Swiss-Prot record:
UniProt pathway annotation: Glycan biosynthesis; sucrose metabolism
Activity versus pH, per record: Optimum pH is 5-6.
Family: Belongs to the glycoside-pentoside-hexuronide (GPH) cation symporter transporter (TC 2.A.2.4) family.
UniProt biased composition (Basic and acidic residues): 1-11
Domain of life where this protein originates: Eukaryota
Description of how activity is regulated: Inhibited by DEPC, protonophores (e.g. dinitrophenol and carbonyl cyanide m-chlorophenyl-hydrazone (CCCP)), and SH group inhibitors (e.g. N-ethylmaleimide (NEM) and p-chloromercuriphenyl sulphonic acid (PCMPS)).
Observed phenotype of the null mutant: Defective pollen with low rate of germination. Reduction of anthocyanin accumulation in response to exogenous sucrose or maltose.
Organism encoding this protein: Arabidopsis thaliana (Mouse-ear cress)
Protein name, UniProt field: Sucrose transport protein SUC1
Catalytic activity: sucrose(out) + H(+)(out) = sucrose(in) + H(+)(in)
Pfam family, one: MFS_1
Job description of the protein: Responsible for the transport of sucrose into the cell, with the concomitant uptake of protons (symport system). This transport is both voltage- and energy-dependent. Can also transport other glucosides such as maltose, alpha-phenylglucoside and beta-phenylglucoside. May also transport biotin. Required for normal pollen germination and anthocyanin accumulation induced by sucrose.
Induction notes from the record: By exogenous sucrose in roots. Induced by sucrose depletion.
Length: 513
């Protein structure tokens, strides 16, 4: 399909609020866009800590395995519900502080509350009656689960308005929109690197000796310390950005009495489903490609360190001491691989715009890197086979050879290339397509988020049972993920419309009819 043609929306087309014309004067200076994008570093620092430190913390609290998946499921569930709602209201917020800033500030405050509950769950549980000798600390688990859910809600409250704010600052300029999302992806990588580095340092708790208590061992103390650093970084970048970058107060466009009556009669989720009803073909294609892309990504994001511990190192979390140690070494190597992945992601994010131009556009770049993702996921089978062959000659508890370990870590690093595109291009295309169709940035990005979280829920619920059907291990899910990545690449190249070089400025629209 050729370049996406702008179609001026009609009154029946619905409708979703966007910026008024006076807010679309010129794109904001790059320094302001970078300032807002830097909030991603604070958000992602906390996410990296979750991945690197919460597993031993969960074991410390004694959360049963059958319930742990439900706790991790809260991310996509809260994303599916919270982000569209936040996007809806941020498109229509009339606060004197602007449309996006109140939500970003609220999200940052909720993150502070959440990490406090998570970090001090063991201490609060002990004060409320948990016994140190008990394996399962019920009260601490309840506090931890509450904090974990609040943290996911807070992150979704932050990220949607941040991306919508970047789209506002780009003022309908397609190139500036792509650059803004590339910087957002870059700062996500910065936050990841900082988080994984902090999580891998076992003596970080010495910065704050008070973090170690009778109920809180070294893992717990390190978690507290890391979260203190995380919230400090998040508050610094958030306060700086919200103070430095102006967010104009929004006023709804004039409507007649019939419009007001119809708008007020439509409930919130009517607006959300209405967005699907009036969505143009480019946005539908974007949702399909994005959903397939995340079916490909999420199994690896969930099981990458487990794959290192189980298939590459040959360990077992439920085996004997030597087997458990091998598994632990594999998980630590996986965390190192994630750091390499984040470093590559960061550098790739800075070059997304230039590389996209050289390859002929954003959709072509996305299609190509999806094939890189498919090849990388398929290579996990080869790395696993080499690791198994080495154990046949060196012994079951020998661990991987240096070449196998290097190959696995290289795989982590290479996958940082497609991940950088996944974190930037779909959001940039959603902003561009919504500007062309007149849809609100916040709600459009919230709808796009559904194409991300629904695949995550499917993988979270079905990944384990699917692997068990084929004898366990992580490879069955990785193979399906590779196939999904290849299909996503084909669709990105064939059915996804090319965005215009410079999208025209959005037109003001009335309420939903």
């Amino acid at each position: 399909m050729g370049a996406y043609e702008t179609e001026k929306p009609t009154k029946d087309a619905a409708a979703l609020e966007t910026q008024s014309p006076e807010d679309f004067d010129q794109p904001s200076p790059l320094r302001k866009i970078i300032s807002v994008a830097s909030i991603a570093a604070g958000v992602q620092f906390g996410w990296a800590l979750q991945l690197s430190l919460l597993t031993p913390y969960v074991q410390l609290l004694g959360i049963p395995h059958k319930w742990s998946s439900l706790i991790w499921l809260c991310g996509p569930v809260s994303g599916m519900i919270v982000q569209p709602i936040v996007g809806f209201h941020s498109d229509r917020c009339r606060s004197k502080f602007g449309r996006r800033r109140p939500f970003i500030a609220t999200g940052a405050a909720l993150v502070a509350v959440a990490v406090f509950l998570i970090g001090y769950a063991a201490d609060f549980g002990y004060k409320m009656g948990d016994k140190l000798e008990e394996k399962v600390k019920v009260r601490a688990i309840g506090i931890f689960a509450l904090g974990f859910w609040i943290l996911d809600v807070a992150n979704n409250t932050l990220q949607g308005p941040c991306r919508a704010f970047l789209a506002d600052l780009a003022a309908g300029d397609a190139k500036r929109t792509r650059v803004a999302n590339a910087f957002f992806s870059f700062f996500m990588a910065v936050g990841n690197v900082l988080g994984y580095a902090a999580g891998s340092y076992t003596n970080l708790h010495k910065m704050f000796p008070f973090t170690m208590t009778k109920a809180c061992d070294i893992y717990c103390a390190n978690l507290k310390t890391c979260f203190f650093l995380s919230i400090t970084l998040l508050l610094i970048v958030t306060v700086t950005s919200l103070w430095y970058v102006n967010d104009k107060q929004w006023s709804p466009p004039p409507r007649n009495a019939d419009d007001d009556e119809k708008t007020s009669s439509v409930p919130l989720f009517g607006e959300i489903f209405g967005a699907f009803k009036v969505m143009k073909r480019p946005m539908w294609m974007l949702l399909i490609v994005t959903a397939l892309n995340w079916i490909a990504w999420f199994p690896f994001l969930l099981f990458d360190t487990d794959w290192m511990g189980r298939e590459v190192f040959g360990g077992d979390s439920d085996g004997n001491e030597r087997s458990k140690k091998l598994y632990s070494l594999g998980v630590q190597s996986g965390a190192m691989g994630l750091m390499f992945n984040s470093i590559v992601l960061g550098f790739m994010s800075l070059g997304v715009e230039w590389i996209g131009r050289k390859l002929g556009g954003a959709k072509r770049l996305w299609g190509i890197v999806n094939f890189i993702l498919a090849a990388g996921l398929a290579m996990t089978v080869l790395v696993t086979k080499f690791a198994e062959d080495h154990r046949k000659t060196a012994g079951d508890l020998a661990g991987p050879s240096a070449s196998v370990k290097a190959g696995a870590l290289s795989l982590f690093a290479v996958l940082g290339i497609p991940l950088a595109i996944t974190f930037s291009t779909p959001f940039a295309l959603a902003s561009i397509f919504s500007s062309c169709s007149g849809a609100g940035q916040g709600l459009s990005l919230g709808v796009l988020n559904l194409a991300i979280v629904i695949p995550q829920m499917i993988v979270s619920l079905g990944g384990g049972p699917f692997d068990a059907l084929f004898g366990g291990g992580n490879l069955p899910a990785f193979i399906v993920a590779a196939i999904a990545a290849a299909i996503s690449g084909v669709l990105a190249l064939t059915v996804l419309p090319s965005p215009p070089p410079d999208a025209p400025k959005a037109t003001t629209m009335g309420g939903f009819h």
